Design a protein with these regions (language model features):
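Extracellular, surface-exposed repeat/solenoid domains
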Residues: 1-62
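Short secondary-structure subsegments characteristic of cysteine-rich extracellular domains
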Residues: 2-26, 123-138, 257-266
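Outer membrane beta-barrel translocator domains of Type V secretion systems
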Residues: 64-230, 234, 345-346, 351, ...
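Solvent-exposed, glycine/polar-rich loop segments of beta-barrel outer-membrane systems
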Residues: 73-77, 161-166, 195-212, 244-267, ...
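Residues on the lipid-exposed face of transmembrane beta-strands in outer-membrane beta-barrel proteins
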Residues: 132-136, 172-178, 190, 220-224, ...
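Outer membrane beta-barrel transmembrane domains
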Residues: 228, 260-367
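Short, structured loop/turn "capping" segments at alpha-beta junctions
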Residues: 229-235, 245-249, 283-288
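Outer-membrane beta-barrel porins/channels
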Residues: 234-235, 239, 253, 273, ...
Length: 367
């Protein structure tokens, strides 16, 4: 086998005899073809040598150039972590929004969310996200302060033209929400998530990889709920989430070529602006609040860098920024004095990656 990372030099040339034939044989009868190995297209350099009785074809070198498709495939595989980060971000502040919709009733709560997403290159993913938590209300001068604790579990899977796999994630976080008498509010949350991943790729001989990663999240949201009437409101809002996603590295061989791909820890910074509107409907012993939201979510920092290495050298692929429009509609219902149930539908559009549809159901018991 040829070590493709050991480039031939004038002092150390390859000279591997491949085949020989009678002297009068046409030189074009034996030709070498281009082959994709690793992240490169490799073309052998074949020379002929003629003696009195035969002609010999020998491998004296090779030319390597980057294969753009393999490079894109590697970058797409490593972008799965960012998409998982984004799905966690979209679920960070759900509980605090519920608190405003149920007039600030603290208690125990549970939420389940299921969704699907898609991007170019045949990429699609789906996930089921479960949250449970408990919070407490503190009545202060001019505001109500809620503090709480949450734990989460997410099962997700993703696939594209050249890879597929699944991730199991568990996380825990602390949150606080300050709701001022004026209608203004501030939400804060910090969260840690551990991910166990298993992915199989069909490019560059990568095969199946099991690996663990983790991520941190720190989010803040501020807004103002303005009551148009006693039962109807409009709520402009802005959110900023800063985080950290751990890196990973793979090393292997493809047909004798040493390969590696890695990304370092990186720090996403995601912003969102939007507006929600809502209206409550009530009867003698029931109350339902309908809500609709429209927002714009955007990356403020590029998302990491993927580094590939093979015979053609090192390739650095910088992460791209993305943005999308967010849309949601939902209902919150009072079942009994201390029991609430909510249902919400969401999707996004105009992004490189979009949530095609997501449904979120939550149950709350106040005490």
């Amino acid at each position: 086998l040829v070590d493709f990372l050991q480039k031939p030099t004038p002092e150390k040339q390859l000279n591997i005899e491949l085949v020989s034939a009678p002297k009068d044989t046409n030189e074009n009868v034996f030709k070498a073809s281009k082959q994709t190995i690793g992240f490169s297209d490799v073309t052998p350099v074949i020379t002929t040598r003629e003696t009195d009785d035969k002609i010999t074809w020998s491998l004296t070198g090779y030319n390597t150039v980057a294969n753009k498709e393999a490079t894109r495939n590697a970058a797409a595989l490593f972008s799965v972590d960012y998409k998982a980060f984004l799905n966690e971000v979209n679920n960070l502040n759900k509980r605090m929004g519920d608190l405003r919709d149920i007039n600030g009733e603290a208690g125990a709560w549970a939420r389940i969310m299921s969704g699907t997403g898609s991007a170019s290159g045949g990429f699609s993913d789906n996930y089921t996200h479960v949250q449970v938590g408990v919070d407490k209300k503190h009545e202060l001068d001019g505001l109500d302060l809620f503090t709480g604790f949450t734990v989460t579990h997410t099962d997700s899977s993703a696939s594209a033209d050249v890879f597929s796999g699944k991730t199991k994630s568990v996380g825990a976080g602390l949150y606080a929400s300050a709701m001022f008498d004026s209608g203004a509010y501030i939400d804060l949350i910090g969260k840690y998530v551990h991910h166990d991943n298993e992915y199989t790729a069909t490019f560059a001989g990568l095969g199946t990889r099991d690996y663990s990663t983790h991520s941190w999240y720190a989010g803040a949201e501020a807004g103002y709920r303005y009551h148009v009437t006693e039962d109807a409101w409009i709520e402009p809002q802005a959110e900023l989430v800063y985080g950290s996603v751990s890196g990973k590295q793979f090393a292997w061989k493809d047909q004798g070529m040493h390969l590696s791909m890695k990304d370092k820890d990186y720090n996403p910074l995601i912003g969102r602006t939007g507006v929600d509107v809502g209206k409550s409907f009530s009867g003698k012993d029931w109350k339902v609040t309908a809500r609709a939201g429209l927002g714009y979510q955007f990356d403020l920092l590029a998302n990491g860098e993927t580094v590939l290495r093979d015979a053609s050298g090192e390739k650095r692929i910088k992460g791209e920024k993305d943005s999308r429009m967010l849309m949601s509609v939902g209902l919150n219902a009072e079942i009994r004095d201390n029991v609430r149930f909510g249902l919400e539908f969401e999707k996004s559009a105009f992004g490189k990656y979009n949530v095609d549809n997501a449904v979120n159901a939550n149950f709350r018991y106040s005490f």
